[in-house]
């Protein structure tokens, strides 16, 4: 027997073993199991490699044992809220919070997402505005700057932000930068050399320990967080790069949604950053530092919870929050998302809302940045069009916003897309906002986006050509592993 025959036989045996693992050991979602079995069957050698990189379920194993809030900062507030829930003494100060108390309860109990009502929130929908504000806040920093992004590019915007951080580090401000290795794969280590020399610290999330193989490649930190002096925070969809200023000809204008906030909710963002930082850092880990959690009094009256999820989570908290919002809807649901690949539970919740007479509106991009994801999105959109949803295609560039608004009362803004990757594999963060004024601001933004969007009807969907139907079918089949 030739060497090639032996190798083929070996790969065939390994494929069978992997199939057994996929079916019996991993205990994954049935649709994901079938998708991986198809990959292993049709492309046995490449499929084996892809499974090692993207398919092996490392969820909630020793890989993710870094969750420890007790020495970080919000444990005391969380303890009081859990006690108030048990004794039914929890208080709400406005209609939006009272009407959604079951959602607030769920996120406190299952995500330890502390609820605060002393926040001010600014909604930002333009990249130039976002980074102008961020650079202004950085220039005023006195104690520390904590910055975390999935994508950080070494282009003009990346350099401008880096140089601002270098200046603050030279002034004695503590600067910490955390970026994801895969998302920021074009960034060279020397890019932050001067920042390190100025006293700043830079860490990489889940770097490859054995290049080019990284068994944690499938689990990426998709969070975008900035905390300045423990008083001002940013969270949302914008990464760092010129394309987010609308300078990439492929995408054109980049429409995203970010929020700038002040208030006790910043402490929750700070806690999340420190937990992620301590996982990535081996020499500069952080414990509780009073300056990271200053007591500066109320900044507003916006109710809010900072909700995180990831492969270290027991529950898919952000997805569960979405489902609860949708299930509680009485009048309307507005969704903006670049990718729409819901699992069965979320799809059913939206379908039931449509069939119950709720006005469900969904806005998606007119162009793909990931082809398979785009075609899978159209497939699921077809299901909801049939159920009565209204769908809009954004035509003024690329819409990357991840927002949900329900009944013009509550909203979610953050990093999580409506897809399986965001719900189960990526580390994500969303702000759940219980405030009519902020909700109406997001509704107004949605209406402004309608002016540069076109309605996508069910009749139009039914008339799509055969080649698009084939693309959709294949992409949907693979959607659980995209």
Swiss-Prot record:
It is an enzyme of class 2 (transferase). Residues 217-244, 395-422 form the PLD phosphodiesterase domain. The chain crosses the membrane at residues 3-23, 34-54. It catalyses: 2 a 1,2-diacyl-sn-glycero-3-phospho-(1'-sn-glycerol) = a cardiolipin + glycerol. GO terms for biological process: cardiolipin biosynthetic process; sporulation; transmembrane transport. It is found in: Cell membrane. It is a multi-pass membrane protein. Its EC number is 2.7.8.-. InterPro entries: Cardiolipin_synth_Firmi, Cardiolipin_synthase, CLS_N, MetI-like, PLD-like_dom, PLipase_D/transphosphatidylase. One of its GO terms (molecular function) is cardiolipin synthase activity. GO terms for cellular component: plasma membrane. The active site is at 222, 224, 229, 400, 402, 407. Gene3D superfamilies: Endonuclease Chain A. Catalyzes the reversible phosphatidyl group transfer from one phosphatidylglycerol molecule to another to form cardiolipin (CL) (diphosphatidylglycerol) and glycerol. Belongs to the phospholipase D family. Cardiolipin synthase subfamily. This is Major cardiolipin synthase ClsA. The lineage of its organism: Bacteria, Bacillati, Bacillota, Bacilli, Bacillales. The gene is clsA.
